[in-house]
């Protein structure tokens, strides 16, 4: 019930911010649509997305925080509920989504953690994603059904991350006023 689907606030801009960018290319190469909680009230909340490039497209579920320390709340929830976490990971696999972490801690932060959850405990952010280079599919109505099914199957992961995110808000780790920069 907190998901924002207003296209004015959920779709990327075509113009690129060229400040501090040497290339000064005016337009983006990729475009995206995000389905997420309202950014000003829920900064850094997990989200579903669909994106496309000139030669590929993809979709998935992601959770990135601008405070790396905030992501430890996700790790804590994984440790507290490893069965629920692994069920959510399996749900994402069933949806055809692949796990990826853009940044990881080099040091083992949880040396006593069970082996099956260890790969996820070094992540500073996470996503489960799908990519395709078959651009003929992008104009197909069946892609919408595919997205709906994948996002529905991945719902346990979104719920898991939303619980971790709500813990961050409750503990004051992430504050809505921090989003206004």
Question: What are these model-predicted stretches?
Answer:
Residues 1-181:
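Charge-dense, helix-prone N-terminal extensions
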